[in-house]
């Protein structure tokens, strides 16, 4: 059933993690400590973590009834992107199976991280821990950062700074401040994708009591200014 879960884990969003990872690999290809096999292990871990967190987002959204709220809003004439887990509501999979799929993807990511940790040392553990907490807390746990106006910031940190400095350290065993600076720019680009969705869904998010950066900004003028 692996293909089923890969297909439902929003693989269309994978460029958001793969492209920054490849960019970091290209930036780290010159140092003497560069390792291609470490790059492959790290890339596999990043992909599995991304898919796992996408499915975790589905799991937590299902728990709070996100689909029901959006369907009700569409019925009232408001624009609301429909739910992300038709495979659950249609009976193709159960919530328990979804939870297990999340565990499998994230477990593979952790194994990849432990391999890199063994060869590169404790900084990788710190990056993994921060990424794990942010990934789960985006829509789950007590924080639910994506529901309180911090979703765009979380995405920018995870897919920009953490991903790129983690990948570079994995392939080279060193940190480069040039990569750190570039990772901030990449994070802002990825953040723009999420922010654009929040601008389009601002009315639906307001009705569903979901706070996003677009809602924090308020006026259309401020929203467009931030997008620029």
How does the language model describe each region?
Residues 15-24, 153-168, 215-219:
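Small-residue-rich segments of transmembrane alpha-helices in multi-pass membrane proteins
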Residues 29-34, 59-63, 122, 140-148, ...:
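Membrane-interface elements of multi-pass transporters and channels
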Residues 84-174:
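Intramembrane alpha-helical segments
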Residues 22, 32-56, 125-133, 176-196:
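Membrane-embedded alpha-helical segments that form the functional core of polytopic membrane enzymes
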Residues 1-41, 45, 53, 143:
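Topogenic membrane-insertion module of multi-pass membrane proteins
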Residues 56-103, 190-228:
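Solvent-exposed interhelical
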Residues 12-16, 37-41, 97-104, 123-127, ...:
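Alpha-helical transmembrane segments of integral membrane proteins
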Residues 153-202, 206-208:
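Functional transmembrane core segments of multi-pass inner-membrane proteins
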């Amino acid at each position: 059933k692996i293909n089923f879960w890969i297909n439902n884990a929003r693989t269309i969003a994978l460029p958001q993690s793969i492209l920054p990872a490849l960019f970091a690999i290209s930036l780290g290809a010159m140092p003497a400590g560069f390792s291609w096999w470490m790059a492959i292990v790290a890339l596999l871990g990043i992909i599995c973590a991304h898919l796992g967190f996408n499915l975790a987002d589905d799991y937590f959204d299902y728990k709070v009834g996100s689909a029901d709220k959006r369907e009700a809003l569409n019925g009232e004439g408001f624009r609301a992107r429909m739910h992300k887990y038709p495979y659950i509501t249609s009976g193709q999979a159960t919530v328990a199976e979804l939870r297990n799929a999340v565990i499998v993807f994230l477990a593979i990511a952790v194994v990849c991280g432990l391999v890199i940790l063994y060869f590169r040392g404790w900084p990788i553990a710190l990056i993994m821990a921060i990424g794990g907490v942010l990934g789960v807390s985006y829509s789950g746990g007590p924080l639910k950062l994506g529901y309180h106006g911090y979703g765009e910031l979380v995405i920018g940190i995870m897919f920009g700074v953490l991903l790129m400095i983690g990948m570079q350290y994995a392939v080279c065993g060193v940190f480069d401040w040039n990569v750190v600076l570039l990772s901030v720019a990449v994070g802002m680009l990825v953040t723009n994708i999420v922010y654009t969705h929040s601008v389009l869904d601002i009315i639906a998010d307001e009705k569903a009591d979901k706070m996003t950066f677009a809602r924090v900004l308020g006026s259309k003028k401020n929203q467009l200014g931030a997008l620029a």
